[in-house]
Design a protein with these regions (language model features):
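A structural micro-motif
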Residues: 246-249, 534, 561
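Short acidic-hydrophobic, aromatic-tinged amphipathic segments that line or gate anion-handling sites
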Residues: 557-573
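Conserved SAM-binding loop
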Residues: 87, 538, 563
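Intrinsically disordered or compositionally simple regulatory linkers and C-terminal tails
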Residues: 1-18, 574-596
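The feature marks cytosolic C-terminal regulatory regions of anion transporters and related permeases
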Residues: 384-557, 575-581
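Transmembrane helical cores of multi-pass ion-transport proteins
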Residues: 1-453, 485, 553-554
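Generic hydrophobic alpha-helical segments
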Residues: 98, 182-185, 489-493, 570, ...
């Protein structure tokens, strides 16, 4: 029976949980630092406010869901995360996932999936797997991020153009898929509202141009204020523009931190929610750790990946308890925090508290904001997410990277994010395995030295005084010996060793890794040669392959006398074996004469 030391595992897991807030307070916290954090927190709150509302509505949810997430998850990420300056909350990357889960499983399913994702993140952090998410290939990340950006932008066409899709939908819900939405928008195009188009253009112009005026006040806040006033003026003239209040009438009564009423928890299928929850966890982990790495470069410190994942997990467990949605670290808000003087998690906590005050006391005024304005704000976010310059750079990369990126992009747009990440990672892994297998080779050094093969001679075999004796063949192996290269390795040896030498030296100084499949191929080579009277000698075996050979018993089968650290010793062993074989043959020839 396996004995597991759960106390040790628990102690190790808790040792990985070292929130940055605790470390900052232990180092000492001054009023000067608090003042700097307070200013940064206020500015970041101004940036986060319109985004929290816009992202929530873009996902098909009321604005209080996004605000609750910005408050609860934003506070938890700062309090329990492993990055000093991380700002958390709802992000545009989650819009696609949230929309799909909400459409299929309802609000209860979305809350359950968010909490499940939080548990997954906590487990990953406690198990010390904070770095495993970093192994997702870069082309996969660029591909699905660009795909999400395109879907987000497409989802804002209704708001940007002020379309009335009710006739085209005929009482049904808006399709969750990309092509389905475009079809509905195309049929609804005659209902375009030119006043909404004007507000959308004004929003885009203000958000883009305001940066030239000042970066202390977010352009999105200015756009919301100005376009809301414009919409009120148009309404007084009899021109109607859809607002948050007209789509979500309950907002006029104010916002609260509470679970939505009327949810059927008994209908939640937790097994069916595992895959969506995994998508949330992966995306939250990727986004938060990427944001933390960017923050490290800006402040000259290093974050704790495991603690950051635990903090993200806690935030996603708490967020749905107050009516929130999935959350993660936000790169743009984190950068804004740093640029405005935020240096400790207190800035993130204050940003959440400022948003809470706005939510409780000014939330009812969100009903006046035009939907076209939010569409413009989200469209800007989608453009920034797309990072087309990275896509252009990858298109000039290897064909394998381009294939992985395009696969992730197309699957994100046409299928869903879960399939895109899984397929992208698998495709990247298979292509990497193929490249690694192609780079592994076994070269016949004997033929090369004799001038029968082209190529560079191994450095020390051409030295004076080192001569490969007749009846010996030497093969030099380059690269990793693993399942992707095992057959190629075996076929090369067996096809080139056509003369059946008496001694076959396998030089393995450039083989740093050996797996079970490659070891099995090596066993087959040994069996093939041994059955034909050929002795296999190994030279320069590195640590990991040698350890595997010892554990598997392969070293005992070929004999430890036939394993040497240097090629000179291996050649000396070959001479010894050849001399022994020669003397044995001579005695065998004399024996019949003596018998007569």
């Amino acid at each position: 029976m396996l004995n597991v030391n759960w106390k040790l595992i628990g102690k190790t897991g808790l040792d990985r949980f070292r929130p940055a807030l605790w470390e900052c307070l232990r180092e000492g916290y001054s009023w000067k630092t608090f003042a700097s954090d307070a200013v940064a927190g206020l500015i970041v709150a101004a940036v986060a406010l319109p985004l929290a509302i816009a992202f929530s509505i873009a996902a098909g949810l009321p604005p209080q869901a996004g605000m609750a997430t910005a408050v609860v998850a934003g506070l938890a990420i700062s309090a329990f995360g492993g990055c000093r300056v991380q700002i958390g909350g709802p992000t545009g990357a989650f819009i696609v996932i949230i929309y799909g889960i909400y459409a299929q499983f309802g609000m209860a399913g979305l809350m359950a999936a968010t909490a499940m994702a939080g548990v997954m993140l906590v487990v990953l952090g406690l198990c010390g797997l904070g770095s495993i998410i970093k192994y997702i290939p870069y082309p996969v990340t660029v591909g699905f991020t660009s795909g999400i950006a395109l879907i987000i932008f497409a989802g804002q066409i209704e708001a940007l153009l002020g379309l009335d899709c009710s006739t085209a939908l005929a009482g049904a819900k808006m399709p969750g898929d990309f092509l389905g939405k475009l079809a509905i928008y195309a049929r609804s195009f005659p209902t375009i509202n030119w006043a909404a188009v004007g507000i959308s253009i004004a929003t885009l112009a203000i958000c883009i141009g305001w940066k030239r005026v000042t970066q202390r006040v977010p352009g999105s806040i200015v756009a919301i204020v100005m376009t809301t006033l414009a919409a009120m003026a148009l309404r007084s003239l009899g021109v109607e523009v859809e607002t948050i209040g007209s789509r979500f009438p309950e907002v006029a009564g104010g916002m609260t931190l509470a679970l939505p009423k009327g949810m059927d928890w008994g209908a939640v299928d937790f097994r069916a929610l595992f895959s969506p929850a995994l998508s949330i966890a992966l995306l939250a982990g990727i986004e938060s750790l990427l944001s933390a790495v960017v923050a490290d470069g800006m402040i000259g410190r290093r974050h704790n990946s495991n603690t950051e994942l635990i903090g993200q997990g806690i935030a996603n467990i708490l967020s749905p308890l107050f009516g929130g949605i999935p959350a993660t670290g936000a790169i743009a808000r984190t950068a804004t925090n740093i640029k405005n003087g935020g240096r400790t998690p207190v800035a993130g906590i204050l940003h959440a508290l400022f948003l809470l005050l706005v939510m409780l006391f000014l939330g009812r005024y969100a009903a006046l904001i035009p939907m076209a304005t939010l569409g413009g704000v989200v469209a800007i976010v989608a453009y920034n997410m797309s990072e087309w310059h990275l896509v252009k750079g990858l298109l000039r990369s290897t064909r394998s990277d381009v294939l992985v990126m395009l696969t992730s992009f197309l699957l994100t747009v046409l299928v869903d994010l879960t399939v895109a990440i899984q397929a992208g990672v698998l495709l990247a892994a298979f292509l990497f395995i193929r490249r690694m297998g192609e780079s592994t080779e076994a070269r016949d050094v004997t033929r090369l030295l004799a001038g029968h093969d082209e190529g560079r001679r191994p450095d020390d075999l051409g030295q004076p005084g080192i001569v490969i004796p007749e009846g010996t063949e030497v093969f030099e192996v380059y690269g990793a010996l693993f399942f992707g290269a095992a057959d190629k390795f075996k076929d090369t040896l067996l096809s080139h060793a056509h003369k059946l030498p008496r001694v076959l030296i396998l030089r393995m100084r450039h083989v740093l890794m050996l797996d079970a499949t490659a070891l099995h191929s090596l066993e087959e080579v040994y069996a093939h040669t041994h059955a034909r009277g050929v002795t296999l000698v190994l030279s320069g075996v590195t640590a990991q392959p040698l350890m595997l050979m010892v554990r598997s018993g392969f070293l005992d089968r070929i004999g430890q006398d036939n394993v040497h650290s240097h090629i000179i010793d291996a050649i000396a062993r070959a001479r010894q074996l050849l001399a022994t074989t020669t003397s044995t043959d001579k005695r065998a020839q004399r024996t019949p004469k003596e018998a007569r």
